[in-house]
UniProtKB/Swiss-Prot annotation:
Homodimer. The N-terminal domain probably binds unfolded/aggregated proteins; the C-terminal domain interacts with ClpC. Belongs to the MecA family. Pfam families: MecA. The gene is mecA. Residues 118-128 have a biased composition (Basic and acidic residues). This is Adapter protein MecA. Residues 118-137 are annotated as: Disordered. It comes from the Bacteria. Enables the recognition and targeting of unfolded and aggregated proteins to the ClpC protease or to other proteins involved in proteolysis. Coiled coil: none annotated.
Length: 239
């Protein structure tokens, strides 16, 4: 973690995601677990106080900027004399509230983080049941493709006319790459499957990753009518 003293009332710090994980906090827990989130930010404040003698007195104003490799946080003490007369308990309560506002932001500034992570949590719980259902899928046919980035996923959701909305589909992510799997029932005509695959290949690429591999090593981002969910959470990209 890099700490910069801006002036008597303001400090700025930059911490990488790898540094966050090295301190025993996962990125997902940090943004969704209130107790763990507060524990992390208070530990940051203790470290700032040790290095810069920046004692928490009264209300603090917190501003966060997310970048590809980490998060930059600016922390300022209030200069308002009336606010400085707050009790220690009130100041602590306000800081906790500000931390919660901070935790409510996504790493890209999206407002729907909590809802997305709740969905992902449900999907993780469903992974076990999906494995139990694997035997029932012996009569289904699955296609798996990969997207180079999120923009390609969004373009597919907006510019294709997918028939896949009628079938179970899953969007995975592993090593920064998005994988999309679609399960076709045994009664589906092969021509329909070929047409769906052709549409996918306008935005995605073939892959040798299997669904077994993805279930073991990837994270499920969305499931069940993925394209509709992508359109709900993300605006259409422009050229």
């Amino acid at each position: 973690m890099r700490i910069e003293r801006v002036d008597d009332t303001t400090v700025k710090l930059f911490i990488t995601y790898s540094d966050i994980e090295a301190r025993g906090f996962s990125r997902e827990d940090l943004w969704t677990n209130r107790k763990r989130g507060e524990e992390f930010f208070w530990s940051m404040m203790d470290e700032i106080n040790e290095e810069e003698d920046f004692v928490v007195e009264g209300p603090l104003w917190i501003q966060v900027h997310a970048f590809e490799k980490g998060v930059e946080v600016t922390i300022s003490k209030s200069k308002n004399e009336d606010m400085m007369n707050m009790s220690d308990d009130d100041a602590t309560d306000q800081f906790d509230e500000q931390v919660q506002e901070l935790l409510a932001q996504t790493l890209e500034g999206e407002d729907q983080l909590e809802e997305l992570f709740e969905q992902r949590t449900k999907e993780k719980e469903a992974q076990g049941s999906k494995r139990q259902k694997s035997s029932a899928r012996k009569n289904t046919r699955t296609i798996v493709v990969k997207f180079n980035d999120l923009e390609d996923v969004i373009n597919y959701a907006y510019h294709s006319n997918p028939i896949t909305t009628e079938f179970e589909d899953l969007l995975y992510m592993v090593d920064g790459t998005y994988y999309y799997a679609v399960h076709f029932d045994s009664h589906v005509d092969q021509e329909v499957i070929n047409d769906s695959y052709s549409q996918l290949l306008e935005f995605a690429y073939p892959t040798d990753r299997t669904e077994v591999y993805l279930n073991d090593y990837a994270k499920i981002i969305m499931s069940h009518n993925v394209t509709a969910q992508v359109r709900r959470y993300f605006p259409e990209t422009t050229e």
